[in-house]
Amino acid sequence: MWSPLILPLLAQIFACAFGDAVNEGCNVDPKGIHGLWYLDEPFGVYLSAIYNGSLAYIMMKERVPAIVTTVINSLEQDNDEIVQKYGVESQEELHRIVDSLKSLKTELSTNQPLTNLPLAHDEADRDAAVWNEHLDRQREIEGPNLSYFFTRFLLAESYTFRKMAHAFALAKNVRNFDFFGKQKEHLLTNSAKSLPILAHRALLEANRSKATKDEMREELAKFLKLSLWGNRFDLAASSGHEITQAGDPIELLSSFDEDLLIDHTRVAWDILNKPHGPNDPVIVDIVLDNAGYELFNDLCLATFLVSRGLATKVRFHAKQIPWYVSDVNIHDFHWVIGYMRSSSDPHLKEFGDLCARQLESGSWSVEADAFWTTFHGYGEMKKQAPVLYNTLSEATLLIFKGDLNYRKLLGDLNWEHTTSLDTALFHLDFKPTNVLSLRTIKARRVRRSYARDAASCGRRTRRRWATGRTGVIVASAKNAQCACAKSR
């Protein structure tokens, strides 16, 4: 359905990039990038930094280079500490990595073509060859000038983070060093005062002997909203600068309601509360976003789901490599639980022990598939990662956290604002099961057909689109005839 719109766009992009004269609709960036369009993305096209009025442009021009700079600075500042941990041979590796990241920043800021990843001599970086195959295929579609500002935003942004990780993958001693690790740990420790409050609430619900349906529905809504608003703690959106949560997050929940543009918590309740056979497992998959404070809230939600019998198993999906600054990897997941278990606060320690038991018993699991660190939208999952797609199809509810997951659900296309998530997923052929997206808005894509009037909602939020202050809890039931699909 998109080719009539995309192919002319690609032709115009090619003309802007390679034409002898500046074409109508094209211009030169003040800092020297020729061929940008001084307008927002048209509807029906992939998001791209070629549009000077877009968030994609801001991200690729300012925030992503700032993230690369932050990593360079932290490596130089922590050089002695890293060498002490990984050995004297890591010194030269760090120098090479810093040089590589500086080159990456230059390539990015000057809109150079994306190059294939050099292959390692072992299996430590297995998906590099897969990335190169996809890059070659994309060049066949877009042409040889597959550059940061002219290609799809999702490809350019993901490639930048993948290339940062690749600089370490080519090393021997610091191969497993998480260059975002300290920042992710600070996301939790900076919110230390709020953690015992949340842990206490999760424990109360886990140990509660009896609750009415109405009480359970209200508590589910609270834990979903806590998980949502924890998504404000996104280091990629803040260019890697630290963020702090203070105060009682439960008491603050009601004050955030005016910022919740779409609230489908009732749909989630109806999906999970449907009758199931005694031997039918109720699996909830959570595709994680940020480590630290947000992950802590996700653990609270998962504890509530299992302890109240709304799920028999929760499967967490993390990343294999450092990704988008604060995304959760397997180490981050276990680190948070270990942090709680070693705490002197009794509620925090008890909650950490409970989380560990849920992992040991099999009520929880944490997994990481290479697909999560590609540039593919989720409409491509069935073809690119069929095993993962089939695994997700086993779930009763599939929860996606954060802005990047939301963009991938929509194929990183600029849909009309009134397009429902149901419509987008139908056209992109992604419907493994019931889907719930918890996302604070850091871009301009929000499906508003179930929210307030789209025009007034747009006026109200335009200045806040990229701030993460507003959010959505939006559902798409697999069976549109199901009663849960009508409860929005």
Curated annotation (Swiss-Prot):
GO terms for cellular component: extracellular region; nucleus. Keywords: Hydrolase, Manganese, Metal-binding, Methyltransferase, Nickel, S-adenosyl-L-methionine, Secreted, Signal, Transferase. Residues 1-19 form the signal peptide. The keyword Cell membrane does not apply. One of its GO terms (biological process) is methylation. Substrate binds at residues 289-290, 403-407, 442. Its EC number is 3.1.3.-, 2.1.1.-. A motif (Subfamily III RTxK motif) lies at residues 439-442. The keyword Ribonucleoprotein does not apply. It is found in: Secreted. Its cofactor is Mn(2+); Ni(2+). Pfam families: ARMT1-like_dom. One of its GO terms (molecular function) is protein-glutamate O-methyltransferase activity. It catalyses: beta-D-fructose 1-phosphate + H2O = D-fructose + phosphate; beta-D-fructose 6-phosphate = dihydroxyacetone + D-glyceraldehyde 3-phosphate; L-glutamyl-[protein] + S-adenosyl-L-methionine = [protein]-L-glutamate 5-O-methyl ester + S-adenosyl-L-homocysteine. S-adenosyl-L-methionine binds at residues 294, 327. Automethylated. PANTHER family: DAMAGE-CONTROL PHOSPHATASE ARMT1. Belongs to the damage-control phosphatase family. Sugar phosphate phosphatase III subfamily. Subfamily III proteins have a conserved RTxK motif about 40-50 residues from the C-terminus; the threonine may be replaced by serine or cysteine. Metal-dependent phosphatase that shows phosphatase activity against several substrates, including fructose-1-phosphate and fructose-6-phosphate. Its preference for fructose-1-phosphate, a strong glycating agent that causes DNA damage rather than a canonical yeast metabolite, suggests a damage-control function in hexose phosphate metabolism. Has also been shown to have O-methyltransferase activity that methylates glutamate residues of target proteins to form gamma-glutamyl methyl ester residues. Possibly methylates PCNA, suggesting it is involved in the DNA damage response. This is Damage-control phosphatase ARMT1. It comes from Pimpla hypochondriaca. The gene is vpr2.
